[in-house]
Every structure is written in C-alpha cells, then in structure tokens.
C-alpha cells in the first residue's frame, strides 16, 4: 500500500514555498536604473560604431563634419501630446542620428539610426512635432524615452561634457576614428571633452531614478570608451 501525503503536510509545503518566494521574488524585480544605464552605454557604443563605418568626409562640402553621427540627450518639450513621447519638459530621452542636413538637430525619422534589435524602429523617442508624420510615429522607439520607460527623473552632465543652458541636454559626436566631441562643432576636429578649467576629462553622465538612486556613465576622451559605475541598488 502506497503512502500518501496528508492534507496537513501539503499545507505545510505550500506555506514553506510561499515564504521562500517572498524572499526570492525581490531579487527578480526589474532594476530600471541599471537597465537604462546598460541601454545608454550600448547605444553610445553603437553611435561610435556607425561613425567609424560611415566616414562623412567630402572634399566638395566645407561643412561635411556637421553630418557626423550623434548621440543626443534632450528634455525639450516636443509639444506633441503623444503617450510616452515627452509631454512635458521634465521628460528625458535621447536620439542617435546622422545630421545630414547640418541643421544641428534631428529633423527627419530617416536621419535616425535603425534599432539594431528591431529594424522597424528608429533610435529616437521623438523630435520636432512638425516632422512627426504618421509613418514617423510608427517608428518612434519609446524605450529611448528614459522618463517614461525607466522612471529616470533627472540627468546631469559634468566634467568633459557640460550641458547646454538650462541643462536641456548634450550632444556627443564621433569622428571616423571613433573619437568623441562635445556639442555642435565649428571645425572638423575640435571641441574635445574638457572640463571648466580646460583640462581634458571624461564626459560624466549621472542618471537619477524617481526613487533617488543614481548611476554614473563615463565616456572617455580620445577613445570614447564607455563604462558604468556607482549604480545604487534598490
């Protein structure tokens, strides 16, 4: 005759499993801050890769260098009331694009890089509302909207990449050798990463989650090497 579990034994097992799950479950909770940092670092590296395989040099165009590939942080209001596409000025997002028009801004969905993980999407979460056609809206990538997707409330830029006025964002451009530049260049090779006293320094990007935890991303001058450090656990 086979022995069977009693009802009491089954209840005890269920209780033990429940207690174990209560301790284990938090370890599997989503870490928005680290996910955002990993994604940003990967896309900065991807921008550098695009710049190195897409040399923009053109002897017939004196402003050829303005077309280089750009990684751009911004929190400027798009004035387009679309769910998840920056409905207010405290909505951080970023774009990866080649400034083909030389306007210093992303003006067309076709200028944005294709998402290497999903070719139907572009590496932008929104830009000038006048350019957001129905086709463009389908290609927007909400994972690049850091506030909406990852609950990132603020981003600070220090050392080699001081933000523009009002801290509305920065631009990191890469040349054909993968070297990073800060902002909108006036010459082909200039505007290195330098701090307030003119010393060459890494670009330091600090993300702050809505719960107050922070994570820092560094982009090194000359090499463009990207590292993540000092990520708080929560």
Short names for language-model regions:
Residues 1-32:
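N-terminal single-pass transmembrane signal-anchor helix
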Residues 32-65:
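Membrane-proximal N-terminal amphipathic helix
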Residues 34, 56, 92-99, 213-215:
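Terminal alpha-helical segments
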Residues 54-96:
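Short, glycine/small-hydrophobic-rich surface segments
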Residues 97-221, 227-229, 233-234:
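Intrinsically disordered, low-complexity regions enriched in Pro/Ser/Thr/Gly and acidic residues
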């Amino acid at each position: 005759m086979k022995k069977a579990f009693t009802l009491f034994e089954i209840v005890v097992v269920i209780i033990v499993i429940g207690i174990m799950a209560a301790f284990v479950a938090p370890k599997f909770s989503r870490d928005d801050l680290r996910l955002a940092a990993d994604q940003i670092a990967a896309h900065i590296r991807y921008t550098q890769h695009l710049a190195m395989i897409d040399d923009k040099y053109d002897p017939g165009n004196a402003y050829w260098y303005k077309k280089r590939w750009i990684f751009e942080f911004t929190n400027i209001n798009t004035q387009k009331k679309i769910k998840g596409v920056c409905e207010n000025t405290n909505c951080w997002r970023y774009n990866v694009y080649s400034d083909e028009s030389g306007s210093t801004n992303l003006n067309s969905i076709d200028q944005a890089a294709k998402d290497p993980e999903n070719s139907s999407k572009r590496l932008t979460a929104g830009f000038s509302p006048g350019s957001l056609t129905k086709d463009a809206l389908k290609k927007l990538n909400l994972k690049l909207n850091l506030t909406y997707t990852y609950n990132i409330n603020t981003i600070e830029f220090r050392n080699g990449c001081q933000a523009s006025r009002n801290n509305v964002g920065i631009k990191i451009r890469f040349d054909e050798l993968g070297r990073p530049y800060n902002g909108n260049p006036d010459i082909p090779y200039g505007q290195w990463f330098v701090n307030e006293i003119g010393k060459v320094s890494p670009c330091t990007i600090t993300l702050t989650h809505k719960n107050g935890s922070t994570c820092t991303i560094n982009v090194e001058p000359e090499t463009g090497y990207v590292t993540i450090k000092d990520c708080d656990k929560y």
